[in-house]
Amino acid sequence: MGSISEMVFETCPSPNPIHVMLVSFQGQGHVNPLLRLGKLIASKGLLVTFVTTELWGKKMRQANKIVDGELKPVGSGSIRFEFFDEEWAEDDDRRADFSLYIAHLESVGIREVSKLVRRYEEANEPVSCLINNPFIPWVCHVAEEFNIPCAVLWVQSCACFSAYYHYQDGSVSFPTETEPELDVKLPCVPVLKNDEIPSFLHPSSRFTGFRQAILGQFKNLSKSFCVLIDSFDSLEQEVIDYMSSLCPVKTVGPLFKVARTVTSDVSGDICKSTDKCLEWLDSRPKSSVVYISFGTVAYLKQEQIEEIAHGVLKSGLSFLWVIRPPPHDLKVETHVLPQELKESSAKGKGMIVDWCPQEQVLSHPSVACFVTHCGWNSTMESLSSGVPVVCCPQWGDQVTDAVYLIDVFKTGVRLGRGATEERVVPREEVAEKLLEATVGEKAEELRKNALKWKAEAEAAVAPGGSSDKNFREFVEKLGAGVTKTKDNGY
């Protein structure tokens, strides 16, 4: 039996291929994993329609050759993009209120996605299954309205899935206004301090809209026939086994690693990648470069950026630093790097870019460690590439991921506890942690552990691996005609 990449779905006698519609919340960290899943599904001979907002569509069109509604071949199937107008301009001040925005998006999204489903039904291309990612649980309502099976792609760890599940379920105690420092004891998860749970679940969080949007998915959990998780069994074995006994959780990751096997120019990136950073890495010695990137949403204080920069200089290590303009709705200034760092870069000691192909960078032999915000996509990519990390989490699931990287996976060192700590890590500590992760006995141990997880990730997506098997079963279920069964075996 072949691997995920080799399997081709044998369609039934119907002249129309199975049609799967993927609906994504806007944002690089949401679009990328769902699009990877979409490309994999399409490569098996299915038709995939990928849907997100017009605002994000505009960014994708600028960076990629995307034409709305145009079928793009992917393996034995095809994929196309559809974008719906959410009616608010990018600079609309109402976007800053996430609770207000998410309610508006639900109202518009239900209407527009329903129109799309109806349009394809009338065009004799009925949607067979709807799949969404977190923050837009209303996709399940659309599926229910049209009597279409639905599934979810969870783009955080299974440990975080368990945290939200048990918070919603009420079976585990979480911090409250009266007990804000309560430790959280989830089944099959290490005890988490109050600042180590997904921060949206803490009563002090300003982001109540995020909390409610994610919990909305858990209120609709019984409507989904499957919850796909971008993780792999051996990485979170105990909590995956436990959660699988409660709901239809199936690991299919690392998705980015499997997606590499699909030959396609379809991309959801919003910036054009450059090969200049890869060419520069080619000129550096093995395991000599610190790669620094804090994702597309995490925003560190300017003072902290300056201390990290001076810490890098103090360490004497070469660096590749991605500095991206912050999202418009954050209403904050773009980070400014110290002149000394820019001068060091000009002399060839480092490189500063606004975008880079992170997957390729992390797999480059010159990279010694990754200074990261610990978002799940970056966490999976670092583990699957065998790269140690310096953890600089900010909020959301990042603080929980940092605990796992440091204490469970043992591939990282800590550089702060998150935004709630309200502490600026000094340059001396930054330099110390960078050297700890790149030079000496501790660095060797971190690298050894990271390479172990890289091998485990490869085994998961290889023929017969856990993720390979789960994805096969999922696609076969789509082809057989999904029924709304609630049993955990699909």
From Swiss-Prot:
The organs and tissues expressing this protein are described as:
Expressed in roots, flowers and siliques.
Query: Binding positions for UDP-alpha-D-glucose?
Result: Q358, H373, W376, N377, S378, E381, D397, Q398
State the name under which the record lists this protein: UDP-glycosyltransferase 84A1
What are the EC numbers?
A: 2.4.1.120, 2.4.1.177
Active-site residues, Swiss-Prot/TrEMBL? H30
**GO-annotated molecular function:** cinnamate beta-D-glucosyltransferase activity; hydroxycinnamate 4-beta-glucosyltransferase activity; sinapate 1-glucosyltransferase activity; UDP-glucosyltransferase activity
Q: Indicate the family of this protein.
A: Belongs to the UDP-glycosyltransferase family.
Instruction: From the UniProt record, give one GO term of the biological process aspect.
Output: response to toxic substance
